[in-house]
């Protein structure tokens, strides 16, 4: 397979995950893949959006919303971008996956590589549990899980605050969302995109 299609469903309230999945999409392209970037449906009523949410929604207005009944068909790999909510995926992403039962029955994602990108307010705000709990859903779909090995030296840095672990890529947003992804975190996101695409090619042989 020369041009694997990598589906990147994401939810981003304040722009952190959007920034990270765009970097992952760049990595997919660098490895010869075709990134398919789509946001999942919002559940928060528009009347409750604050100015920051409105700003991010405007930034993402050209990104299509994924239809759970169609989005998984024909993809060769998947990178899920989801913020942490109490150590789990956000309700918006849960809502998406809970509507994919038809593809679960058909085995659409069996044997396809999958990875997770997340964000949290603090360094110990549930990043790894969110990644792992999201992976449980991906395992039920039959995916082959892809993490970030320590050959990616960016996750070993000690001279700055940074996300990233063997389980997947992450960023730290700050309590009020004031910290955007660092260059170090974006390198990891791009690297994950490359790695997953390369694995998708190998699995299709």
Model-derived features with residue positions:
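N-terminal beta1-alpha1-beta2 submodule of the flavodoxin-like/Rossmannoid cofactor-binding fold
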Residues: 1-108, 158, 172-205
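Intrinsically disordered, low-complexity segments enriched in small/polar residues
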Residues: 9-12, 148, 165
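Short alpha-helix boundary/capping motifs
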Residues: 56, 124, 166-167
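Short, glycine-/small-residue-rich phosphate/pyrophosphate-handling segment
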Residues: 110-162
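Mobile gating loops/cap/lid regions near enzyme active sites that modulate substrate access
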Residues: 161-173
């Amino acid at each position: 397979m020369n041009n694997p299609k990598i589906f990147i469903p994401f939810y981003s309230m304040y722009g952190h995950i959007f920034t990270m999945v765009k970097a992952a999409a760049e990595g997919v392209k660098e490895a010869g893949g075709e990134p398919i970037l789509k946001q999942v449906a919002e559940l928060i009523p528009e009347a409750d959006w604050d100015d920051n949410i409105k700003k991010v929604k405007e930034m993402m207005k050209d990104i299509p919303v994924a239809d759970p009944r169609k989005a998984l068909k024909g993809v060769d790999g998947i990178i899920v971008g989801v913020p942490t909510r109490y150590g789990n995926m956000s309700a918006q992403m849960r809502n998406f996956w809970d509507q994919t039962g038809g593809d679960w029955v058909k085995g659409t994602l069996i044997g396809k590589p999958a990875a997770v990108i997340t964000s949290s307010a603090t360094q110990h705000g549930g990043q790894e549990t969110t990644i792992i709990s999201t992976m449980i859903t991906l395992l039920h779909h039959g995916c082959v899980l892809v993490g970030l090995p320590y050959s990616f030296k960016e996750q070993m840095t000690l001279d700055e605050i940074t996300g990233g672990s063997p389980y997947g890529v992450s960023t730290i947003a700050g309590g009020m969302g004031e910290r955007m992804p660092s260059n170090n975190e974006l390198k990891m996101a791009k690297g994950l995109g490359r790695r997953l695409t390369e694995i998708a090619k190998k699995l299709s042989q």
